[in-house]
Amino acid sequence: MRAIVLNTIKYSDKDLIAELLTEKDGCLSFMQRINTSKRAKIRTAWFQPLTRLDVDYDDRPAHKLKRLATAQPLPLLTIPYEPAKTTMALFLAEFLRVTMRSEPASPLLFEYVWNSIEWLDTCRESFANFHLVFLLHLARFFGFEPNLEAPSPNCYFDLESGTFTTVRPLHPNVLLPEEAQLLPTLMRMNLATMHLFKLSGEQRSQLLRFMNNYYKLHIPNFAELKSLKVLQEVFA
């Protein structure tokens, strides 16, 4: 069964808790023995953010903290070794952990995340906009993908409905026309074309703040992301 590492927390000198996004059961927490030996059946080094695993575990619901029976990694080629990709992986893993914590399993969402990691890991250049494209299309699986096509210039963007409007909404969750003018650019991006869009560091930060605030409005109990500021600084 496929799984993706989202987070690890040291539980004791001998154990850690690993949070995995699993294909079958969504987000699960596992108690795992800390073992750095190369002969270990399951190595601690495999539990880096966005590492993809093939795992087997006892899925009985009575066990809140589960145990892995077996695990085999699909080694990452570049993400752990390129600082920009590592920073992006830390952010996306934290983002997925926050958004997926109470969500039911979704094979389509899992496939999207799995394939996106593959793309980032094998991409050699021009990936600075990857996290923006990833977050935009991830929203589709939650049912609130924004419509970023502006009907005319000088429109407001309603964060609650996820659409542009020529009339300013009465609620405060709105982007003014000058704040929303970059959104149609984001809508035109995908993994194949995003390298064609040359954004400044400030523009990229602005779009990231938009996506973060948009999710915060639509996901209950959306926590503050510790890695957000670091990501903004790296891609400024």
For every predicted segment, state its role.
Residues 1-236:
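Non-catalytic alpha-helical scaffolds and adjoining flexible linkers that form interface surfaces
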